[in-house]
Amino acid sequence: KNIKVIEHANDLVPHYLRFICGVVDSPDVELNVSREILQKTKVVEMIKKQITKKVLAKLKEIANEMPEQYIEFWNDMGIILKAGIPEDEKQKTKILELFRCKTSKSMTNWRSLKEIKEEMVEGQDTIWQLTNVTTPEQIVALPILEGFKKRDWEVMLLTDPVDEWIVMGLNEYDNVPVKSVSQGEFDDEEEDEE
């Protein structure tokens, strides 16, 4: 009765979780005539939803309870996982909890958005990000960051090629706006006072 139907069930996991491996055993999955392709039914959608929910919950558990192991995972699969930020609006909040990045204050350690938000300084009402530079060291040397450094504002340093696309879905975290440093405008008088 139990038979292997397909090797890669792309309809059962979202693209940003394509790194997971496993077996789905269900008597309710309908097949097409060739028995090689799943029919897109409510059952398949329900299975996909449950797999996504369980995988994201397990990743959060690992991130919270075994942060060193999670960072190893992030180094290998973070570029794939963060693609879910603009792709999956329903799971975006959960994916943002798993997101890690280097920052202007932490170029060697990965930081979560939660940590960045919790450590915002007085007067900072936005989480800032900068993309499209190959290394954090290059980014920190940019003149555009001077105003942020003077204010002691942390800036997310996003160096992966896909980050330009990722930030299109990253406009807010936990009711705090996320903006590009190119949108940061500083009052000249304020800078002179410092």
Enumerate the predicted regions with their spans.
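Conserved GHKL (Bergerat-fold) ATPase module
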Residues: 1-194
